């Protein structure tokens, strides 16, 4: 199956997972798994959450972000990939002093 993000409706998810501002995403959902292109403007974030029954892969396309993984912060930039295993806890934010949007691709699979 080929997915074209530009053909998937853009959704705006305010305070996603308890984060700041909103996550804008072109999100495909097959009833079990999610594949999406996400955008966080400066100051926006995805709140801290745990993947109880899923795992997630995030690939940073452009911009800079701060990833919180199990209580430790890591700077992520274009070309970085993050894997959150089942049971893992994380969040992602675009620092408010950032000059550009944080664009990323993510896949959340049930495992």
Language-model features, listed with the residues they occupy:
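Glycine- and acidic-residue-biased ligand/ion/polar-headgroup-sensing regions
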Residues: 53-65
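A short, N-terminal "cap"/entry segment at the start of jelly-roll beta-barrel domains
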Residues: 1-32, 47
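Short acidic-glycine-tyrosine-enriched beta hairpin
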Residues: 71-86
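Ligand-binding loop in jelly-roll beta-barrel domains
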Residues: 86-111
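Conserved short histidine dyad/triad with adjacent acidic residue
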Residues: 36-51
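A generic "binding-loop/recognition-motif" signal
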Residues: 42, 53-54, 72, 88-89
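Short beta-strand segments in beta-sandwich/barrel cores
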Residues: 45-46, 63-68
